[in-house]
Amino acid sequence: MAEQINESHQRFLQVLMSHGIMESSLVRALHRHCCEVHKVNYMHDNLDDFVGVLNKHLQPLFMKIEKGVGEEDGLTYYALVNRVENDITKMASDYAENELELFRKTMELIIISENGFAPPISILNLADELQSKKMKKKEVEQLLQSFVQDKWLIGRNGEYTLHTRCIMELEHYILNTYQDVAKICNVCHKIAIQCQLCENCGIPLHLQCAGIYFRGIANPLCPNCKESWPHEIPDLSQVSSQGPSHSQAAPVRGRNQRSRNISTVARTSR
């Protein structure tokens, strides 16, 4: 029989859900806070067990708290992921049909791009290609801000890429839908959106994976074809010292169906 969840688990889950995704240091602090507030025995190395108890109760709802690595900062993140819906219909409670269609097209632009980014002008032009209700340019601009706020996209230097949360939640959809063009990192074997490509054989490496793999090597060679690696090796110390961006830390808009599911977990576990 699964261990019962208590008020500390419920508070932890509600906060994680309100943020959508949280960096691991914040999750560890949240774990401690929840245990202390509800006077539950706290052990700093017990986070995995704490999350494991929650995941056992989330399993019947086809939801899970998972860990992933941010492509931009290499930090570990925790997110509440819906495992039964393998496409972007999981976003349907927050967006209209034409908005979801625009997101699909935007995601495709990002995935097929060489650097993992889509310029805003290309996304704005998608408004004229929608099969459902057309959108005005101003509406597209406002929608992009909503995608950023809800942590599906990240805006960086005027362009857009997929948020860590989006990659974690839509991993299966991306692999199934874009299996011929989706890039898989040669080192960690995870989806690679922002990456470096070998100019000879075309294999991709996450920026973080490239930094780790080539660390201390004066003349880096492609791990696949052994040709000279043509790119500047990322400085991991500079990236990691930046910490998570504000968009990674801010809460997202509420999700009604997911909120009801969480309430069900809390009630049935008492």
Swiss-Prot record:
**One GO molecular function term?**
protein dimerization activity
Enzyme Commission number(s): 2.3.2.27
Q: Where is the composition biased (Polar residues)?
A: 237-248, 259-270
Q: CDD domains this protein is in?
A: RING-CH-C4HC3_NSE1
Region entry Disordered, spans: 236-270
Residue spans, zinc finger RING-type: 185-226
Record-level GO BP terms: DNA damage response; DNA recombination; DNA repair
Q: What class of enzyme is it?
A: transferase
This protein's GO cellular component annotations are: chromosome, telomeric region; nucleus; Smc5-Smc6 complex
Ordered alphabetically, the record's keywords are:
Chromosome, DNA damage, DNA recombination, DNA repair, Metal-binding, Nucleus, Telomere, Transferase, Ubl conjugation pathway, Zinc, Zinc-finger
- Subcellular compartments: Nucleus; Chromosome, Telomere
Q: Which reaction does it catalyse?
A: S-ubiquitinyl-[E2 ubiquitin-conjugating enzyme]-L-cysteine + [acceptor protein]-L-lysine = [E2 ubiquitin-conjugating enzyme]-L-cysteine + N(6)-ubiquitinyl-[acceptor protein]-L-lysine
Which domain of life does the protein's organism represent?
Eukaryota
Q: What does this protein do?
A: RING-type zinc finger-containing E3 ubiquitin ligase that assembles with melanoma antigen protein (MAGE) to catalyze the direct transfer of ubiquitin from E2 ubiquitin-conjugating enzyme to a specific substrate. Within MAGE-RING ubiquitin ligase complex, MAGE stimulates and specifies ubiquitin ligase activity likely through recruitment and/or stabilization of the E2 ubiquitin-conjugating enzyme at the E3:substrate complex. Involved in maintenance of genome integrity, DNA damage response and DNA repair.
State the similarity comment: Belongs to the NSE1 family.
Q: How does it assemble?
A: Component of the SMC5-SMC6 complex.
Q: What is this protein called?
A: Non-structural maintenance of chromosomes element 1 homolog
- Provenance organism: Xenopus tropicalis (Western clawed frog)
What lineage is on file? Eukaryota, Metazoa, Chordata, Craniata, Vertebrata
